[in-house]
């Protein structure tokens, strides 16, 4: 049909009057325009329209083209058609239907001003006119104007199901509840469009009670469509009711209802955002989801696969399946997928994350700011700044040097890698800084124990401090023993409502007071807290009780910790065992360890890392799993022998007291992972050209013990080198028999 239509000689048609043009030909012309539009050739349709006789340029033809422009967001052709129509008044009368098409076209194309002008000049309007403009405001993000227009509409005509569903799309709880009530009054609540919109509206409130109101609406719907199910799952997900969301999904699946990409994305979000799910439930559901995505073919969609990767990595810490899934995506891996897998490994396996970043570059993909941010997080988990320097160069080459977020990430990475000078250089070179920039620099100084530098930086801060700012300041004062300065900063937080102390600030103050052996004041702060102390507070107190041998308060903190984090956390048992050991109560210490074994609680393995010749070497206490174990032991033995001549005496309080053989007890103490790492670095340094390097860097996953701290101080004097150690709390700069922490850590 369209071929014959396009071949019509319009010159021949013009010789006939409009009276002789059959209405069938006019309908055929309109249908021909629609066919061209459906085939994606809107330009040809518009060209054909302009070259047609006036008699064929009917209101139906205009309407068809306005609708096409709306669907394809073609504002330019829409405006030209509107001008053409106004310049041919015999083609256009004040027609409500045609004006509605115009409003819809302008609204869909994002020009809400023109849509409003058409609406305001209409001599009469119907429900479609109001709905089209309301929808336009909502889609443009101007929900307030849309709701005001809806309120005005009620004095002119009744809304229909499409009006209500459009208004509900942007409503908050109170106005949304009123619209829901109106729907019930008008009998429009039975409409699937209205019901779905009501469910979504309640879900957006992020409130459990509202989610159950959505559930009531959901259960009342007799014939649910896929959008209904997805809306209910999304509502529970938004309200952090993951278990409920999964329950809806399971029911949906058992009822034989199909699912789509939106379903799977909402369920994945439910799994890693909700706090009401236990690991076993997450694991079971994740495996089922993975199976369903494979069977349905949706696993080939990048967003779905990336969401699954996030669940595997963040919730299950199952990096094997996470990586396997990523490798199966070889045909559809975009930058979002790469960002997901790099982020997954950034904390768990930083070296793998760096390797993945290298693979991304080999595949000729251009990293975005999120990629660089994730890989810099991985750099922060490595021993040295070597990789951070390389990524920094690529950030500059990629044109991201002015990006504040990336500069903040660079400061964090360099600080964690021990390069405080590079942190300062990045900070000083920044064109603009936000509060995170200042906080990152303050945290860097705090991490390295530079309390004399942190306070001047804080005084120069030209942005209002936030909660994290005071955490950095209080932590620095705590680790440096600057109690009075710390208390002054803490008291200043009460001066403004926006800086009132939160749990973490109280934890810092309690840590600061108890480190200084001011336990009575620490107890008083706990009693005066406006909220219940959390695990962080009791852990801070427990650590200092161990250091100063306060058994009574340590027992209280350990018991509170067990109540809060369940008896499966190793911290309370180990710290109490150490406290009992220190005071010579070995039976009580052993009972604490046996209680830990009864609950099958596993202690975090003691691991250390050092980098030699661009290769990272890992050490576990006792040197297990290393082929060069005997050689490292021999080197360590030599070091210990020399250090004992310098006055080193093993601190037996740091040894495990459940070993009956005293010689074995000392042997166990001397084979802590950081000592092995140092011995290896010394041994390898003699073999390589790096023997003249005056810095040895070691990273440790737990807090350094008293004995190892004493050992490192003397070793720095013996070797004539600086030993830079990062433990779970902070950096220790050992040099000439002293430490930057002044033995206060």
Curated annotation (Swiss-Prot):
InterPro entries, per database record: DYW_dom, E_motif, Pentatricopeptide_rpt, PPR_At4g14850-like_plant, TPR-like_helical_dom_sf
Gene Ontology MF: a single term: RNA binding
Pfam families named among the record's database cross-references: DYW_deaminase, E_motif, PPR, PPR_2, PPR_3
Biological processes annotated in GO: RNA modification
Record key words, sorted: Repeat
Name listed for the protein in its UniProt record: Pentatricopeptide repeat-containing protein At1g71420
Chain segments carrying region Type E(+) motif: 614-644
Region (Type DYW motif): 645-745
Placement of PPR repeats on the sequence: 58-88, 95-125, 126-160, 191-224, 225-259, 260-296, 301-332, 334-367, 368-402, 403-437, 438-464, 466-496, 502-532
Superkingdom of source: Eukaryota
Keyword Repeat annotated: yes
Residues covered by region (Type E motif): 537-613
Family note: Belongs to the PPR family. PCMP-H subfamily.
PROSITE patterns: PPR
